[in-house]
Amino acid sequence: IEAHFDLLTANPELPLFIYREILTNECGKEICRKTLFPNFRLAISLLDRSLQEEIKKGTVRPVKAEDLMVSAISLNIFVFVANPLIQLFVEEKGEEYHQYMERRKQENVEIILSRLRK
């Protein structure tokens, strides 16, 4: 979750770019289908194996890997897609905004962890 958030911090326009490419550009859609989605499916498969082991041990609550992955991605992406709106009510600039983004990253991690905790 943190690595994904950091990737988006370094490339804040990436989520909207990918979204626009999928919606409006057949070539862009095909590139996403061939490059991003296989990696996404692999990540879900690996996550699912780990989750199933922990669910069997009773250390985490049952959850589908796809749902957990979509939740984590959604939490992270929203901060960047809605950034113009967020800046209206956060009213933090420069270092304060950087601190806000760090808090947001940690909050996203905590939300996902709380979904797993028994």
What kind of feature is each model-predicted range?
Residues 3-10, 41, 45-57, 61, ...:
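C-terminal peripheral helix-coil segments that are non-catalytic and often amphipathic
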Residues 63-65:
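Short, aromatic/basic-enriched loop-to-helix "N-cap" motif that marks the start
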Residues 6-46, 67, 94-99:
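Short secondary-structure transition hinges
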